[in-house]
Design a protein with these regions (language model features):
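Eukaryotic intrinsically disordered, low-complexity regulatory linkers and tails enriched in Ser/Thr/Pro
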Residues: 1-162
Length: 162
């Protein structure tokens, strides 16, 4: 382990990484992709995008799956609120081929799983939804999130939550 990592608690950033880390954000690992690197930090997963990098908070990753060659990440968008709950909609999964993945797939999966305190599927008018209590990196407490199941509209969830 390098002296820098021992002193700061931060892993080293890969060459060419242009994201801006928070002062308390720790680098845990990284792996090269065809478009740059995936960088795993205490606050989320940094992914390459046109012109740089962006961080996906652990609380906004609905699913992370490793198929032996690539990491598939399903990111959620915040689509509003209903009472105290944050409504989520999933984006199509993004695929990140990792020729030398190291521990990245396990770290990502573990971080996503540990962000979930509890979850349960509930019936709502016109369908069902997944209710999730999640820890948000860098914040105290938990956030209640609701992800409608396919075919269940956001309005049905809003109505159910009053």
């Amino acid at each position: 382990m390098s002296l820098w990592r021992r002193l700061t608690g931060r892993g080293e950033l890969p060459d060419g990484f242009t994201g801006r880390l928070e002062g308390f954000e720790r680098v845990l690992a990284s792996a090269a992709t065809s478009d740059g690197h995936l960088v795993i930090t205490s606050l989320g997963l940094w992914v390459p995008v046109a012109g740089g990098y962006r961080r996906i908070g652990w609380h906004l990753i609905s699913n992370a799956r490793w198929d032996g060659r690539a990491l598939h990440v399903t990111e959620a968008d915040e689509a509003g609120t209903a009472g105290e709950a944050v409504l989520l909609t999933d984006r199509p999964a993004s695929r990140y081929p990792l020729p030398a993945p190291g521990h990245v797939p396990q770290l990502v999966h573990g971080r996503v799983v540990r962000s979930v305190e509890a979850s349960e599927r509930r019936e709502v008018p016109g369908g069902s939804a997944l209710f999730i209590r999640r820890r948000v990196p860098g914040r105290d407490g938990v956030q209640v999130q609701v992800r409608p199941d396919p075919g269940t509209g956001l309005d049905a969830v809003r109505q159910a939550l009053g």
